[in-house]
Each structure stands twice: as structure tokens, then as C-alpha cells.
């Protein structure tokens, strides 16, 4: 997917309208608890400012349901960006309208304005053409650097590209496409994928697409119990998707047919309930007692999965191995994170597909030891499913 990027255009004196993903978590006092998404947009932002562009930033934050709500204002993001850049960032009162247009036209080279939350208008998520056109009129060049929303055809990501001549990718999207794209198109082998999370249903398309690309798949998280039950094993009170048992068997058969090594856990950590003070122990997967719940992969599985990861040249991970929100049941997930960091040090390319896995790696303090951590949970999943992302497809080739 070769798309034009920021590096391909001249910016000097131009109004550059950039879609960023500043959907950051806020606490009750409206303080940003994690500014990772703002920091990740800095390379594109700095490039535009340093090259004399007039930068207009737009983003959504949370789910304000199509009407103005100060709880979802982007003011904290503008303030944090101003600190990071050490220069003023003007905060607009809206994202469209006469007043905003006047503020935008008054910008000088190298100045920055942050538009208010796009989702204060229902037209954003409806991909309304008039709204998209009004947004487009603010800039002369459009840049999309919001990978996290690239799988959504919204006014600011897809509709807008019909009303601008120049629509290019920012550095963050370029990096995402480079790592995720290379992993799917021409990975160094062996290529190992690790999939976790609670449900098979959310990962079917990913699994089926990866079966055409990878050498080995390691499965963890609660979705293993649907596989176990399908194979006739007892699963106690663990989470099982009863309507996905046949599907689980067909996935096992597909893997065998395509000569893919599909590994399921050999042992499981079980507890009577999912709580931090529950008694827990490791048991073999064919010995899960009635009434017990599987909460993590066991030590033998951790060791086996580690070996597979260390033997790989490309590793892709999406989804935790257990209930990692509880420290005692996070050991399996942390073990995967550590194995990935060690594989990276040994020269492998390691990629984390956003969401919970990214949070787990951050929790383990290993984020800087992974080749690439995707910024888009849903977007990276759809990319791994082999789907075209509308926000990227719409950019200039």
C-alpha cells in the first residue's frame, strides 16, 4: 500500500489540516493519564511547524454522542501539546463555523491551532458530505496521522479526502503501514503469531487471514477454553463460547491442512473465582476440576511459548494470555512480553497489535524493547484481517 506521505509535499506557508488521534484517557479532574497518543503524533507535527506550515489539528475524544459536552473537550490535549512543543497552541471553540475559519486564516507560518472535538457534531461519524466539505475548506493540504481511526469511514478520515487535492499520510501511519504491511506481505521467517483475549469470535478473521501468512500460532486467553471444550476436555466454570465449538474444530483442521503449528496451552492457572485474593494453582489442561475457572496460562506453557518466540524472526502479538488486570494472573502475559523483548534483542522484528497487549507491555516496563507497538487496536485488527482501511485507502497514491 504505497501512499504519499508528508515527505512528498512542500508545506511552507500552506494551511495543513491534520487528523490526529488525541483520544487520550482523562481522570476526574480532566488531567491526561497517558499522553502516548499525543507524543506519537509529534514527529508529524514538528515536521509541519519546522517547515513553516500553518497547522490545524483535528481529533475526537471519547463518545460525546454528537453534541457539545465540556467533559470531552480537547482543551487538555491542546495544553499538553503546548507543553511538549514549548510553543502556544490556540484552542478553537468548535471545529467548523465562521469564527473558526477566521482563526485559521489568521494563522502565521509555524503556528498551531487545535479544533474542538469533531464528535460534538453527529455529522462526523455519519460521514456527512457537507460537514466533510466544511472541514476541508479549512486547509490546503490534508494529512491523516490517526491510525487508530483509519478503519472508520468518518467525515474527518474518509469524506474529507473528496474535497482536497492533496491528501497524504503522516509519519505515524507511514510507520504502521511499514511494520504491519511488511509482516503480512514479506515477513522474515519463522513468523510466529500470538493471539489472546477472551473470545474466538473477535479473532476468527484474523486467524483465517494469518493462516495464509504465518508458520506458528500460539493461543492464550480465555478463548482457549472454547478450543478445549471442542476437543472434549472439561473446562470447569471457564468462559466458553458454546456456539463456536464447531468453528474451533475447523480452525484446528485448517491449521493442520496448511501445515501451521497451532499451539494451545498444556497447563492452566485455575482459581475458584476471578479475584486478587482467590487461591490459585497450575493444572494440566486435561485436569481442570469442576467449578474452577482458568485465569492464565501455566508455567509449562509459558516456557513452551517462550521457546517458539525466541526461535522466530517475526513475531506478532494481539491479546493477553489471562486476566492480566490482576497482577497474580498477569504472569503469562508478562512472560510473553519478556520473551518478545528478548527476541527483539536477538534481532527479530516484534510487533504488538495495540489494545490490551500494548497496555501489558507498558505495565511490564518493556515498551521500548519492542520493534513496533501499534497505536490502533481496532484498526490494526482489521488490517491483520486483510481488510482495506478506508482512512488509508482514501489518501493519494
From Swiss-Prot:
Q: Give any Gene Ontology cellular component.
A: cytosol
**Keywords, A to Z?**
ATP-binding, Cytoplasm, Glycolysis, Kinase, Nucleotide-binding, Transferase
Residues annotated to bind substrate:
21-23, 37, 60-63, 119, 152
Q: Kind of enzyme, top EC level?
A: transferase
Annotated compartments: Cytoplasm
The protein's annotated catalytic reaction(s) are: (2R)-3-phosphoglycerate + ATP = (2R)-3-phospho-glyceroyl phosphate + ADP
Q: What is its EC number?
A: 2.7.2.3
- Record pathway: Carbohydrate degradation; glycolysis; pyruvate from D-glyceraldehyde 3-phosphate: step 2/5
A single GO molecular-function term is: ATP binding
- Cross-referenced SUPFAM superfamilies, in alphabetical order? Phosphoglycerate kinase
Q: Which PROSITE patterns match?
A: PGLYCERATE_KINASE (PS00111)
One GO biological process this protein is involved in is: gluconeogenesis
Binding residue positions for ATP = 203, 294, 325, 354-357
The entry sums up its family as follows: Belongs to the phosphoglycerate kinase family.
Q: Which HAMAP family match?
A: Phosphoglyc_kinase
Assembly and partners?
A: Monomer.
Protein name (Swiss-Prot/TrEMBL): Phosphoglycerate kinase
Organism per entry: Chlorobium limicola (strain DSM 245 / NBRC 103803 / 6330)
